[in-house]
């Protein structure tokens, strides 16, 4: 009977750990997507700096895979999101430096999240092994009682 309670406890903890791991995996995916978006913005600004034309033509996305043609009127400055719905105008150089910092922050958050996920996965494996041992004990005691 004690083995049943212990097995229930281990199974419950395993479910909790699995749920936490799933949340961290989703977090990791969101962090990676956000980092990729910031990286794309940085690369776009770097490429803009290489263009010699003072007012290069661009395509402006308007949704549903549709675009309007436009011209950049100020290719020396960019308006960059700084979070919480705020954006500031920065020179391209400053914007790129700022985006580099954001990418480093994402790298660190991804690293920490991956470490936490690895720990949870290790704990889940330990719990699965423990549950299997309890089940084996139950099977052995059942055979002995016969």
From Swiss-Prot:
Keywords: Chaperone, Cytoplasm. It comes from Pyrococcus furiosus (strain ATCC 43587 / DSM 3638 / JCM 8422 / Vc1). Pfam families: Prefoldin. GO terms for cellular component: cytoplasm; prefoldin complex. Gene3D superfamilies: 1.10.287.370. Molecular chaperone capable of stabilizing a range of proteins. Seems to fulfill an ATP-independent, HSP70-like function in archaeal de novo protein folding. The keyword Cytoplasm applies. Its main location: cytoplasm. One of its GO terms (molecular function) is unfolded protein binding. HAMAP family: PfdA. It comes from the Archaea. InterPro entries: PFD_alpha_archaea (IPR011599), Prefoldin (IPR009053), Prefoldin_subunit_alpha (IPR004127). Heterohexamer of two alpha and four beta subunits. It is found in: Cytoplasm. CDD domains: Prefoldin_alpha_GimC. This is Prefoldin subunit alpha.
